[in-house]
């Protein structure tokens, strides 16, 4: 007998297939995933790739350009005009879509906090009074800090990139385990895929990512805004 379970999260999907016996004609359900096709333009792209050994360390951010077949690094165009976090229509129309916005995720965090305050026993870590969600975002004056839980994934399984104005986070992990007897085996498959719309007032080529103990931390610095002070004469 084979079973398939599908659970969704802000990082889309976590699919596992296991407990398959050879008595069932060796039929195994293939892993499934939920996704929405995205439109990609061949423009400037920033890629954060995991490098080094298997230890969880910081992820180096590499800057490359895909225009005209030129692989030389180019400056990222910054137009600090769109200060608000845009809403992606795909994330609004399809609740299972991997395309999200930071505004949507922050609103979701606020709703979870309100629900927990209304029902004190809900969504709290055992033994503590703190709320623990699979992701967290803090937006302040200088930077945007993000946290995503990716249990079971190493930095070799995770890829963070910036495509145009989208922050793309992908993770994939496949593992096969032997069963307790010779007639059964299991397969675990974890997949994460989300896209967040970035505002214009961030420094895209200075985004940093770090993976520690299955938790991904992303730091997005903001551009410095000159404050112009005008004295008003009092008559």
Curated annotation (Swiss-Prot):
The record's subcellular location field reads: Plastid, Chloroplast
Q: Which UniProt keywords apply?
A: Chloroplast, Plastid, Stress response, Transit peptide
List the CDD domains hit by this protein, alphabetically: ACD_sHsps-like
The UniProt entry, under PROSITE patterns, shows: SHSP
Locate the region Disordered: 1-23, 51-80
Output compositional bias ranges, type Basic and acidic residues.
52-63
InterPro entries in the cross-refs:
A-crystallin/Hsp20_dom, HSP20-like_chaperone, HSP21-like
List the expressing tissues.
In fruits, flowers, leaves, and stems.
Q: What induces it?
A: By high temperature but not by drought or anaerobic conditions.
Query: Which cellular component, as a GO term, is one annotated location?
Result: chloroplast
Report which superkingdom the organism of origin falls in.
Answer: Eukaryota
Q: Where is the composition biased (Polar residues)?
A: 64-74
Biological processes per GO annotation: response to heat
Family from the record? Belongs to the small heat shock protein (HSP20) family.
Designated name of the protein: Small heat shock protein, chloroplastic
């Amino acid at each position: 007998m084979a079973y398939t379970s599908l659970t969704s999260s802000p990082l889309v999907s976590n699919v596992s297939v296991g407990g398959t016996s050879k008595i069932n004609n060796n039929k195994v359900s293939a892993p499934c995933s939920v996704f929405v096709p995205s439109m990609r333009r061949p423009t400037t792209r920033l890629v954060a790739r995991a490098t080094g050994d298997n230890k969880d360390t910081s992820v180096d951010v590499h800057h490359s350009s895909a225009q005209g077949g030129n692989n030389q690094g180019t400056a990222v165009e910054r137009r600090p005009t769109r200060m608000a976090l845009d809403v992606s229509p795909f994330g609004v129309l399809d609740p299972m879509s991997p395309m999200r916005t930071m505004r949507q995720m922050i609103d979701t965090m606020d709703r979870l906090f309100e629900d927990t305050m209304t029902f004190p026993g809900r969504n709290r870590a055992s033994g503590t009074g703190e709320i623990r969600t699979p992701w967290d975002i803090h937006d302040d004056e200088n930077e945007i800090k993000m946290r995503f839980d990716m249990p079971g994934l190493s930095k070799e399984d995770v890829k963070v990139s910036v495509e145009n104005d989208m922050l793309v986070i992908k993770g994939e992990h496949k593992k096969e385990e032997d069963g307790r007897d010779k007639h059964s085996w299991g397969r675990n498959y974890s997949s994460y895929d989300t896209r967040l719309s970035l505002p214009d007032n961030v420094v895209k080529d200075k985004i940093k990512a770090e993976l520690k103990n299955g938790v991904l931390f992303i730091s997005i610095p903001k551009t410095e805004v000159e404050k112009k002070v005008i004295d008003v004469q009092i008559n």
